[in-house]
Amino acid sequence: VVFLITADTDYLINFNPDFTNPKTYVGVNPEETTAYWINEAEKQGYEALYQAHYADYTALFNRVKLNLTNSSDFRDMPITQRLSRYREGQKDFYLEQLYYQFGRYLLIASSRPGNFPANLQGIWHNNVDGPWRVDYHNNINIQMNYWPACSANLSECTWPLIDFIRSLVKPGEKTAQSYFNARGWTASISANIFGFTAPLSSKSMEWNLNPIVGPWLATHIWEYYDYTRDKRFLSEIGYELIKSSAQFTVDHLWHKPDGTYTAAPSTSPEHGPVDEGVTFAHAVVREILLDAIQASKVLGVDRKERRQWENILAKLVPYRIGRYGQLLEWSTD
């Protein structure tokens, strides 16, 4: 038995949304597109559909081979048995190879150009209404989904994230201006496909206040360029987004009386108090300013602003070391 299923949405991504227009995110009629697709699929038949799927998937998946052991021992062992042995402390490099490739497979299956980026639980979870509305959490979750994308030779799978970030820029400019009196754009801990960039409605700033997550998202734009060396992408799409994020970062920093700069107020993602110069925030500040500096050099633009970024970077409060020799997460032990 062959089941053919199609699905679509009337959602249309919009990089320049008009929030006075209730249809600013409305595109195609899904009844028409799904009917067309199902008819075309029926014409193709199972074997042709399977071969097209296999060619599409393996073109990405087969790019990377990972071999942690040359041993062929236990390669046919069932996964349940492997996991049981692994939990007992027995080494299984082949299981680790499988897990790495499983992660690549999940990204291939959930993040392709023209679609939404991978979200909190994915679309195949076992709930009618998934935890946290299965949205996009910008304070580590969506970044974590894409950490291995380029390094695992799946740069195409980054495009849904790139487009999602682009869709946050215009509403993020309003958030930057309204909440922080800053240039540029930013986002908050939670976002959705309809341009939501403001903090959530809560008095608990320890987890809800995290304006530096916008620049954290923007670092993925430079990472994509860094791997692909697509200068046209950097010039036409990437640089302005990175630059605008760096401008927000500059305006958000506190220029202290001693001449140094620090992120204040700042928080560590959903962990600990509101503080001055949280290490997480300073790490992101350093990265986005470095990305902006490098991008402007590659394109040979904005030398004056680049000098400002370099000056602030040099005067950013350094990471602090605690009484036990540890890297402090907050300003004091």
Walk through the language-model features, giving the residues of each:
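The feature captures the catalytic groove of carbohydrate-active enzymes
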Residues: 13, 20, 26-34, 119-136, ...
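Alpha-helix C-terminal capping/termination sites
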Residues: 89, 96, 108-109, 145, ...
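Solvent-exposed, acidic/flexible segments
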Residues: 89-96, 100, 138, 142, ...
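Extended ligand-binding clefts on enzyme/binding-domain cores
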Residues: 95, 134-156, 168, 174, ...
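Acidic/polar, glycine-enriched structural segments that form the non-catalytic walls/loops
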Residues: 1-136, 155-175
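Conserved hydrophobic/aromatic pocket- or pore-lining residues that grip, position, or stack substrates
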Residues: 103, 145, 217
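Alpha-helical scaffold segments in carbohydrate-active enzymes
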Residues: 56, 98-109, 164-167, 171, ...
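Active-site lining segments of carbohydrate-active enzymes
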Residues: 87, 153-156, 160-216, 225-226, ...
